[in-house]
Swiss-Prot record:
Its EC number is 2.4.2.7. HAMAP family: Aden_phosphoribosyltr. The gene is apt. Belongs to the purine/pyrimidine phosphoribosyltransferase family. Gene3D superfamilies: 3.40.50.2020. This is Adenine phosphoribosyltransferase. The keyword Chaperone does not apply. Pfam families: Pribosyltran (PF00156). Pathway: Purine metabolism; AMP biosynthesis via salvage pathway; AMP from adenine: step 1/1. GO terms for molecular function: adenine binding; adenine phosphoribosyltransferase activity; AMP binding. It comes from Leptospira interrogans serogroup Icterohaemorrhagiae serovar Lai (strain 56601). GO terms for cellular component: cytoplasm.
Amino acid sequence: MSIVKSKIRTIPDYPKPGILFRDITSLLLDPEGLALTIGTFVNRYQGKGITKVAGIEARGFLTGAPLAFQLGVGFIPIRKKGKLPSETVSEEYDLEYGKDVIEVHKDSIQPGDKILLMDDLIATGGTMIAAVKLLKKLGAEIYEAGVIIDLPDLGGRKKLQEELKVPVFSICEFEGH
């Protein structure tokens, strides 16, 4: 998917020195790139028995919601603590300096739901691992995690696949951080 990769802008030293930030807003602005991205996911997941798509706040919403629409299934927003109005279930996870918490509405998943988990990219895998654990608490089966970008040097895909047995599909990879 070199077309999709070519539409992703790299911002050096953001948000801190030494980081190469992979910015998907340039991809979202491009009608061809956006259509190709969503179309790639639709083609991969159509007819797989997925019952819901879950997206991790905030960039996972950008592919997850249109994909859910195209697949004819519901969308589950996974949000930071305190952002959902109804009863929630939460999962804490480690950050580089501290901890964070993500939540999902308790009634958004039925036992046996076959969930596709979406985000814009996978780096170290910390947030994605927490999201998988959160969804499994409610009885969901995770079909796969789908991302636009994999940063394989940071090991997130490997962790998700080895520790939680969740396959990861990415449209493109970038080396480095």
